[in-house]
Swiss-Prot record:
Essential arginine methyltransferase that can both catalyze the formation of omega-N monomethylarginine (MMA) and symmetrical dimethylarginine (sDMA). Specifically mediates the symmetrical dimethylation of arginine residues in the small nuclear ribonucleoproteins SmD1 and SmD3. This is Protein arginine N-methyltransferase 7. One of its GO terms (biological process) is chromatin remodeling. Keywords: Methyltransferase, Repeat, S-adenosyl-L-methionine, Transferase. It comes from the Eukaryota. PANTHER family: PROTEIN ARGININE N-METHYLTRANSFERASE, PROTEIN ARGININE N-METHYLTRANSFERASE 7. It comes from Anopheles gambiae. Belongs to the class I-like SAM-binding methyltransferase superfamily. Protein arginine N-methyltransferase family. PRMT7 subfamily.
């Protein structure tokens, strides 16, 4: 088996393919017990009903992945099963899993796309299938090409009376007022502590509809009170998967709604559910907790088990990371809706995506799909826009600026898309030099300069563009720091590398902001996130250990021990206080390699399944909370707690997920190395039992 997996990876592109295998959603989906059980139940009901009617059940499984659904079909009594899987390493793994479960003679595995499958005697399929089971869906339901795949299958691979599992999908939309979500989409005016406006947003930025990319998040984890529901959930689209004529690419539905309460319709929350069988006995919902049909029953079940942990409301319902919910931003209305006011929700989809609009009446001209026209939503991520709008963060920076800048200050800004750096130019300094190597980001910043009539700014398209004569006049170097290429917060240590290269040109007296960055770790018990890395073992009675080995093997080659996750979406309980790992100083000794070692201690090692890691940026040498910008918890964590940790919603943190139980003493040795040549940080956590 090992050679087979390695050969598959080598044939298809080495490291990138190993990374794809290691980070694929196959294991995550297999951990979704509700999905598994409801697919299993729908297969049992569908096949039993066919047999009761005197018909055979010939099953086609498109995108079989691990082979789980095909094996369920055999167990449910299917007369034949054909499974197709185009991702070759996964297909090879499915072949071995099917054999390990003794079904190699009953399931025909076709290692190609369903659109390439042939039907007829001696071909991929001996006959057309009268049962189709598949899960071609993503958060947006149709984003992975479900419409085209179903249409092709109905035309070429399935009988006219085919029964599909799932039978039908329904898309729901809920209109909301949500300032938090809007802060990830729309830039705000930047003001100082006295309320004086420093930067106004150009109109072309304020009215831009933003990125067309789906914004998928765990809606159930939005902080309490962060949104105002303006409508009940509205069913806007239905997809009957067995009806070719209904699976069209382009549709517009207009739904008359009445506002439940007053507010601005800023966004639509979207999710979908699946009616798994034709009779409608089995329903699989992806709704957030407040709209989930089984929320109250599941909450009661949890409260009856006597757990002392305060589980967040959103974690009573089944967890999944492959099918989340999504946020769609609405074109802005200038006046709010009043309670009881009638309005029209416009829902659109093409072959791959959804979008929405609102109006006081039905529209004759359809709303086109959104795309960014201002550049900001191309140059910056949504979480970065959230950072730019973070009032507490901005206040700390601006208060510090007022302390350290003067009318003689010449400020070099080594961050990309830094409105704070631009704001410094409005605070009375002599000049601001903005490092902006990205052409799109530079044009975005130029729009702010022009709209706000900022005169004392010069752009540097590269570090080499800084002339020695001008470098000699610089009094302050400032960075947030932020670079669009950064995935983990400490990837922004690239700032130190830029600073190191410019040092020979800068005066010895230059003030460096931030002065240092400190990495911290927190041992935690994730409620659900650990499942993306947890071994499967058996799943619904089938042995999937071979899949564990496949993912484990390729993770060894491809994975960093720390990955980026927005931890506000994935609740966790702290099992100890915060541990300082390493501090990187930008004022001195940045060029020197650093190695730190230590141990994490937890009192309940059986609960430990992850380590959260983040960085704090210290604007000066004081390490005062008032001059520290943290990408970590909102409140310092000093000890274990049965209350979930509250995380900053505008950052991704680092996560190390554990696959083994630590020793009984509850200690995990760690080491962290900083390489100044690459501006990289390397982590090692020794999970072996001692």
């Amino acid at each position: 088996m090992e050679d087979t997996f390695q050969d598959s990876a080598s044939e298809d592109g080495g490291f990138d393919l190993r990374q794809e295998i290691a980070r694929s959603a196959f294991a995550d989906m297999c951990h979704d017990w509700e999905r598994n059980q409801k697919y299993d139940r729908a297969l049992q009901l569908t096949i039993a009903r066919l047999h009761a009617a005197g018909q055979q059940a010939h099953v086609l499984d498109i995108g079989t992945g691990s082979g789980l659904l095909s094996m369920m079909a055999i167990r449910a009594g299917a007369d034949s099963v054909v499974a197709c899987e185009a991702f070759r390493p996964m297909a090879d793994c499915a072949e071995l899993i099917i054999a390990a479960n003794g079904m190699q003679d009953r399931i025909r595995l076709v290692k190609k796309r369903s659109t390439k499958v042939t039907v007829g005697p001696g071909q991929d399929m001996e006959r057309r299938a009268n049962v189709l089971v598949t899960e071609l869906f993503d958060t947006e339901l149709i984003g992975e090409g479900a419409l085209g795949t179903y249409r092709h299958a109905l035309q070429h691979l399935l009988t006219e009376d085919v029964l599909t599992i799932p039978h039908q999908a329904t898309v729901y939309a809920q209109v909301v007022e949500c300032p938090l979500a809007l802060s990830w989409q729309q830039l705000k005016t930047l003001s100082n502590a006295d309320g004086d406006i420093l930067l106004r947003v150009p109109p072309e930025v304020a009215t831009c509809r933003g990125s067309s990319a789906v914004f998928d998040i765990q809606l159930s984890q939005l902080p309490a009170g962060s949104f105002n529901v303006l409508t009940d959930p509205v069913p806007v689209f239905k997809f009957a998967w067995s009806k070719h004529q209904e699976l069209i690419n382009d549709r517009c539905e207009q739904s008359v709604c009445h506002a439940r309460t007053a507010g601005f319709p800023q966004a639509v929350f979207m999710w979908w559910d699946l009616t798994m069988d034709r009779e409608g006995d089995v329903l699989l919902s992806c709704a957030p907790y407040w709209a989930h049909p089984e929320h109250e029953a599941l909450k009661k079940k949890h409260s009856d088990n006597g757990s002392k942990r305060r589980l967040p409301e959103g974690n009573y319902i089944p967890w999944r990371d492959h099918w989340m919910q999504a946020v769609y931003f609405l074109p802005p209305l200038k006046i709010p809706l009043q309670r009881g006011q009638q309005f029209v929700l416009q829902s659109y989809h093409d072959e791959f995506s959804l979008w929405f609009g609102v109006g006081e009446q039905s529209v004759k001209e359809p709303l086109t799909a959104p795309h960014c026209t201002c550049g900001w939503h191309i140059a910056q991520s949504r979480s970065r826009i959230g950072q730019l709008n973070d009032s507490l963060r901005n206040k700390r920076y601006l208060n510090y600026f007022e302390r350290v800048f003067s009318s003689d200050s010449v400020v070099l800004v080594l961050s990309e898309g830094s409105l704070l750096g631009l704001a410094a130019a409005r605070m009375g300094v002599k000049q601001v030099l903005l490092y902006e190597p990205n052409a799109i980001s530079r044009r975005c910043m130029e729009a702010f300069v022009e709209h706000n009539s900022v005169a004392n700014v010069r752009f540097l398209p590269s570090a080499d563009a800084l002339e020695p004569e001008q470098a000699a006049t610089i009094t302050h170097v400032f960075a947030e720091p932020h670079f669009p290429s950064a995935i983990l917060p400490w990837d922004n240590l690239h700032y130190g590398d830029l600073l190191k290269n410019l040092r020979p040109l800068l005066p010895a007296s230059v003030t460096v902001i931030p002065a240092s960055g400190t990495l911290y770790a927190l041992p935690v018990e994730f409620v659900d996130l650990y499942k993306i890395n947890a071994p499967l073992g058996s799943c619904e009675g089938f042995d999937l250990t071979l899949m564990d080995q496949l993912i484990d093997q390729h993770s060894t080659f491809a994975d960093s021990p720390v990955e980026a996750q927005p931890l506000w979406e994935y609740p966790s309980f702290p099992l100890a206080g915060t541990t300082r790992l390493i501090e990187i100083n930008f004022v001195k000794d940045f060029e020197q390699s650093k190695l730190e070692r230590g141990e994490l201690f937890v009192s309940e090692p059986e609960r430990l399944n992850g380590i959260a890691i983040w960085i704090d940026w210290h604007l000066d040498g004081s390490h005062s909370p008032k001059t520290t910008i943290s990408s970590g918890p909102l409140v310092p964590v000093e000890e274990s707690s049965d209350e979930p940790t509250r995380w900053n919603t505008n950052w991704r943190q680092g996560v190390h997920l554990l696959r083994k139980t630590p020793n009984r003493k509850g200690t995990i040795p760690w080491s962290v190395k900083f390489n100044p040549v690459l501006s990289n940080v390397y982590f090692r956590f020794d999970e072996e039992e001692q």
